[in-house]
Amino acid sequence: LGLTLVPADIRTLSQLHQAIDPLPGDIDAIFMPHDAMLASNTRAIVAVAAVRGVPTSTPHREGVAQGALFSYGFNLYAVGRQAARLADQILSGTPATDLPIETAELDMTVNLAVADYLNLSVPEDMLRHARIAGRVGE
């Protein structure tokens, strides 16, 4: 695909800043994998990306509301509800081994305001598959 990855092993907030600050000036995008530490610092990552005019993807829809271009992943609220329901079943006496294996529902979210800011057009087929395709905060 002609991609060059610039991986960063990030476990602390200081490592996050050490990884973001020296990013090459010619990067085309920032991809954030599923990671609680990165998710809790999405605003900082997106702020750097916005200054550089670089699109960012996150694994959760909440990251799009914080300024990422798009996400394909889980909804934190829905995952919390799912976890609470399963915890309630276990606390009510259902053995954990009797619970079915469940995965979180994945969806795509697109931030059209960020696309406009970055002067990017979002393909119609991508918008058709997006669960939410709106402006910041929608």
Summary of predicted features, one role per range:
Residues L1-E138:
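Short hydrophobic alpha-helices and adjacent helix-cap/hinge residues
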